[in-house]
């Protein structure tokens, strides 16, 4: 892609001295070599990146010797150019340096419709008319903040409470399957907890009974031991001598 301005952009053919020998367009940001030949800055820097000689006279050139031609740039900036929308009907001509300013206000410049959801691009001069008939432009959000997008007919019968209630109902219906699933899981966990609690109670009772049995056995043995000893002593005691009559 060339670095200069398209020749067809100008209202009248430019002087040949203003034409770049590399891209054959009108000089953009002109730069001069030590040999006095002038080129677009972009064109000559690309050239010197591949070759170290002037494109015209083939003399050796060093990149640091390239000089910017600011006065020539201003001269070219005063040349009259056509509007980029000339084919669409714009007949305005203006200095090259002012081309951007005209483009920002040109009634033939294509402009995107600002209405949300509309992808149309229309000439700036007809934008106001387009917005009056734009289907997307006729839709607006509820000014009370419920979030509904309404056209003129809907705005006349719109009820925020009803819209919010309907939205809430839809959300509840979407949540119902999840809530039912969670409820079934809670019930299952409650049943499982009851079973575990009952088994723990039975285990606790069993341990208490077992502990009581273990604690009662030594006491019974201790109480039985003295009775046995007394009996032994009685049996083993010698009999008293009974005098004979």
Curated annotation (Swiss-Prot):
Repeat listed as a keyword: no
Q: Which GO terms describe its biological process?
A: cell differentiation; spermatogenesis
Q: What is its main location?
A: cytoplasm
Q: Where is this region: Disordered?
A: 219-245
The record's listing under Pfam families reads: zf-C3HC4_2
Biological function: May be involved in acrosome formation of spermatids.
- The zinc fingers classed as RING-type run over 20-58
Q: Where is the signal peptide?
A: none
Q: Where in the cell is it found?
A: Cytoplasm; Nucleus
List the CDD domains hit by this protein, alphabetically: RING-HC_RNF151 (cd16547)
SUPFAM superfamilies, per the entry: RING/U-box, TRAF domain-like
Mapped zinc finger ranges (TRAF-type): 101-156
Supply one GO CC term from the record: nucleus
Its quaternary structure? Interacts with DTNBP1.
Q: Name one GO molecular function term.
A: zinc ion binding
Q: In which tissues is it expressed?
A: Expression is testis-specific.
Judging by the UniProt lineage, the source's domain of life is Eukaryota
UniProt keyword terms in alphabetical order: Cytoplasm, Differentiation, Metal-binding, Nucleus, Spermatogenesis, Zinc, Zinc-finger
Query: Mind telling me which InterPro entries this protein's record contains?
Result: Znf_RING, Znf_RING/FYVE/PHD, Znf_RING_CS, Znf_SIAH, Znf_TRAF
SMART domains associated with the record: RING (SM00184)
Supply the source organism for this entry: Homo sapiens
This protein's name: RING finger protein 151
């Amino acid at each position: 892609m060339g670095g200069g301005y398209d020749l067809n952009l100008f209202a009248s053919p430019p002087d040949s001295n203003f034409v770049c020998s590399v891209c054959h367009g009108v000089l953009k940001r002109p730069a001069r070599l030590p040999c006095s030949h002038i080129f677009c800055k972009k064109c000559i820097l690309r050239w010197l990146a591949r070759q170290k000689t002037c494109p015209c006279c083939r003399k050796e050139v060093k990149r640091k010797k390239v000089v910017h031609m600011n006065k020539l740039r201003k001269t070219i900036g005063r040349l009259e150019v056509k509007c980029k929308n000339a084919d669409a009907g714009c007949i305005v001509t203006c200095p090259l340096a002012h081309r951007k300013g005209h483009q920002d206000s040109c009634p033939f410049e294509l402009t995107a419709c600002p209405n949300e959801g509309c992808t149309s691009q229309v000439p700036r001069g007809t934008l106001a008319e387009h917005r009056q008939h734009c289907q997307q432009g006729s839709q607006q959000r509820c000014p009370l903040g419920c979030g509904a997008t309404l056209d003129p007919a809907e705005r006349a019968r719109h009820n925020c409470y009803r819209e919010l209630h309907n939205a809430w109902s839809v959300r509840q219906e979407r949540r119902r399957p999840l809530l039912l699933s969670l409820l079934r899981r809670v019930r299952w966990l409650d049943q499982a907890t009851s079973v575990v609690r009952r088994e723990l109670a039975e285990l606790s009772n069993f341990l208490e009974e077992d502990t009581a049995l273990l604690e009662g056995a030594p006491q019974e043995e201790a109480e039985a031991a003295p009775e046995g000893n007394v009996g032994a002593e009685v049996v083993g005691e010698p009999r008293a001598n009974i005098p004979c009559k």
